[in-house]
Amino acid sequence: MKSLKIASVLSILLLSLTVLQAKTTVTHLRCEWLENPIGLDAPHPRLSWRVETSRPGYLQAAYEIVVGANRAEIEAGKGSHWVTGTVAGTTIPLVYEGHPLAPFTRYYWKVRVRSADDSRWSEWSPIAYFETGMMELTNWRGTWIHDSPDYHIKPAPYFRKEFASSKEIVSARA
């Protein structure tokens, strides 16, 4: 009888330690269902994520999101465009409700979550980004390139420009 009590107490302690050791991570950050998209024209994009944990029966009870145009401020946990603070809820995807987004701008964001059964937050997710596009036709600044006003003629022209960069290229697009 005494050994049964000891075994029960040890089982409960081991289970408690397992729950305490379980790590919860936020992964697969998406904006409009895409990973780090560019050219978004949505003024209120939808943000989503996946919670990965070894804890059985885990249920997200709250989240916190920070969004800003500067990666360093997001790394510091501050966002210039949207800081939700603690929001109770499990809603995913979440609609962006921060300051208006500017066209042709890259925004960085991260999220952390809290479970329903304790008050511990997960670690912050890795930083993700999304980049806005034109947003409105009034932001169009280019002119059409063409070789003839006659639309019955020939295939499209081929444009190219070769160049040499003296520095390492960090990002490029055409």
List each model region and its residues.
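Pro/Thr/Ser/Gly-rich low-complexity, intrinsically disordered linker/stalk tracts
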Residues: 22-56, 126-136
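Exposed beta-strand and adjacent loop surfaces of beta-rich binding modules
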Residues: 28, 46, 60-64, 171
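Recognizes extended acidic, P/S/T-rich segments that occur
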Residues: 51, 58-106, 112, 116-124, ...
